[in-house]
Amino acid sequence: MRPQNVAGVAGTGALIMAAGALADQTVFHPTSLTAPFIEQFIESIPDSRWTVSRATKQTPVGDEIFSYVGQWEVEEPEVYPGIPGDKGLVLKTKAAHHAISTLFTEPIDPKGKSLVVQYEVKLQKGLECGGAYIKLLTDQQDEGLRAGEDYTDKTPFTIMFGPDKCGSTNKVHFIFRHKNPLTGEWEEKHLKNPPSPKITKTTALYTLITNPDQTFEILINDESVRKGSLLEDFDPAVNPPKEIDDPEDFKPETWVDEAEIEDITATKPDDWDEDAPMMITDTAAVKPVDWLEEEPETIPDPEAEKPEEWDDEEDGDWIPPMVPNPKCEDVSGCGPWTAPKIRNPDYKGKWTVPRIPNPDYKGPWAPRKIANPAFFEDLHPSDFTKIGGVGIELWTMTEDILFDNLYIGHDAAQAKKFAEETYHVKKPIEKEAEGSNEDELEEPSSLVEKVQLKVYEFLHLATFDIAQAIKQMPEVAAGLAAAVFTLLGMLLALFGFIGSAPTKVKQTTVKTKAVAPVAPAGEEEKKALDQAGVEIPAEGSKKRVTRSTKE
């Protein structure tokens, strides 16, 4: 073992021993830091400031059929536990809707300040299809904040931030809502090229920082993974373009936008042979001296034996399978030799009229620009609307997702110190418990689970963009549509809307054994079989010749 490897192993061992000793000495203590909002989930849900939603989710047609039946618990982690006594908010129910929220005693106003959002996620059973993001709920003094027992996916939010994974979706969301000052309408702004989340069973720390200079930064596990501008890196952009194409402007009929035209003066050269072949026989080629023309490329397998159950009367004459001729392995080739083909130097193909620059070409046409009547300019989108609370509203296929150590404030240095007290203490303990093995995330095993997961992936994508969901997973959309029509047809048939069933007529059929026709053997194959002493029935014979693979 090399000296540096010995040192590395010794260092790793020291870290593991230190982590184990740290776990023995460390117990959970609430932080002494103060910020606009800090949550460490010390109390059980009934005794805490958090309220589980009792609302129902509405379908697009207004039916209330999906309720938030997912259970929540405040408990210590079961997988790779960290600090003894440290609890978190755990999403407990698989394949269910969950919603829980809390309101601030005073709204948080980000105007003119930095905003820092930080929390931990522990995916104790991995993440098949679902999210682990949080929403900062919009303070609505005029309408009231629909949170608490009334909290739903329709509750307005100011910022949505956190990991999401399902099918092709695998990203850390950063979405903020912006109000159009002209129309008063709200529009979601989605981060372009978002980073990928950490899908592990140990704790991951997610941090979002926005600044008054309109910059932002996303950190995962205290490492920067994405930086950018609120004005430039979101879709759709905060500010619309100053100018737009004039919808009343049309391309003139005389506008020429064809850059090239055919040369009408060109004629086909007299020596242009359109019928010359592309490939010709190489007349200079010579047959290799070791080429065995009398030897076939394949021969009957000498090791093949007719199966004991083979019946010549029923199955036809048995013919052994063909194998490559071993005599041809170390020579240039076997069988009839033909000269190879080469490219014809006189080949020109079909003659076409050459193209020349168009003297009337004016270039590509574009409509003239006019002032955008919907233009406005907001140079400070970081002045988000006031935040009145925090909500977690998720639908996931994987249970036991743990949330802990939420921080919402204005001081990035304070958030980092909070992480040093919490995340950076538990992480080495978890890694020591995890050992040197990589996380083994559970995968769906049965066909039913796999189909169910595909359906959930489609529905998850549809919650953000139904058109994109159909585009990415057309087979699932078609399957769901077929299932709906099948169910509708069954219901109509059940109630007699399709008509009476036709009278069944008993039919008698006579079973006959089909005899497969025999394909005639090729000349080379006939030659090989003849050399092997295999008799080939003459045309018109009632027996069928059947090959068998080697048993």
From Swiss-Prot:
Function: Endoplasmic reticulum (ER) chaperone that functions to stabilize non-native glycoproteins and retain them in the ER until they are properly folded or targeted for ER associated degradation (ERAD). With co-chaperone DNJ1, coordinately maintains ER homeostasis and contributes to maintenance of cell wall architecture.
Residues annotated as transmembrane: 478-498
Membrane topology, record value: Single-pass membrane protein
The keyword Cytoplasm appears for this protein: no
Signal peptide: 1-23
InterPro entries assigned: Calret/calnex, Calret/calnex_CS, Calreticulin/calnexin_P_dom_sf, ConA-like_dom_sf
Protein known as: Calnexin
UniProt xrefs under SUPFAM superfamilies: Concanavalin A-like lectins/glucanases (SSF49899), P-domain of calnexin/calreticulin (SSF63887)
A GO CC term assigned to this protein in UniProt: endoplasmic reticulum membrane
Ranges per topology, Cytoplasmic: 499-551
Lumenal side: 24-477
Traits of the deletion mutant: Leads to a slight growth defect at 30 degrees Celsius and marked defect at 37 degrees Celsius. Leads to abnormal cell morphology of enlarged cells with collapsed cell walls and increased chitin within the cell walls, as well as strong growth defects at both 30 and 37 degrees Celsius when both DNJ1 and CNE1 are deleted.
Family the entry assigns: Belongs to the calreticulin family.
GO MF annotation terms: calcium ion binding; unfolded protein binding
PANTHER family: CALNEXIN 14D-RELATED, CALRETICULIN AND CALNEXIN
Region entry Disordered, spans: 293-315, 526-551
Endoplasmic reticulum keyword on record: yes
Cell location: Endoplasmic reticulum membrane
Pfam families in the record: Calreticulin
Keywords, alphabetical: Chaperone, Endoplasmic reticulum, Membrane, Signal, Transmembrane, Transmembrane helix
An example Gene Ontology biological process: ERAD pathway
